[in-house]
């Protein structure tokens, strides 16, 4: 292997490890803050994430020029981005709320059903049909979650509803983005989209936070007095949320779609194992079996979609 090839391999490997670390890290830290630390403010936590994304996106694109700045060219394009921002907000808030009530392992199992909702919304909104064998691969995706739900000792109905809603919203945003920003003149890469979406999200979340979580400031200040690392944890958590988006963009840029798909599936499994080791939440054979069926269904769906285009 040549020196340049070795450097490229090392670079991509470092990217993937960093991507895994930031994604899994922010997930576990969210769970720790919301369930184990007494910080029960998922909407405010999401607003912190969006604030960090807004500031760091601006620095990365405008000052550091990591990617070229893409300008919004019309009021129509701005309204489309704002719509995506609200849907994106809903998915992140729903996911964070669910972490208050569900173990990370089960949260990831439900999140693995994203392809099912993506296929459903693609059909309902664009009438795009896949081959029947592709839809058939989605059966174990859903069946696995049903089985995992029955075998989950920490099952919580409200947490489950929020988690499934967040998963559906994430898929809806993906399909909606393909529809709204489909013309060449309006397409934005994920980093520029984050640059415009995150400040809109902060503006949308501020009144919701004040209404739904009115005591957030007083409780956070009290927690900060009790736990000296409170502000550091919040800051690190928010920066990691941005890093996860940046590294996702870089991994997508430097690897193939198939590699990204495989890495994404494996990432969920790694997150499950690490979360069980850290939080020591009880798991059952039925729960593990259900999650395994879901992951295999996701892999089969990706493969059939690739083959039967």
UniProtKB/Swiss-Prot annotation:
It comes from the Eukaryota. SUPFAM superfamilies: Multidrug resistance efflux transporter EmrE. It holds the Pfam family TPT. One of its GO terms (cellular component) is Golgi membrane. One of its GO terms (biological process) is mucilage metabolic process involved in seed coat development. It is found in: Golgi apparatus membrane. Its main location: Golgi. Belongs to the TPT transporter family. TPT (TC 2.A.7.9) subfamily. This is UDP-URONIC ACID TRANSPORTER 1.
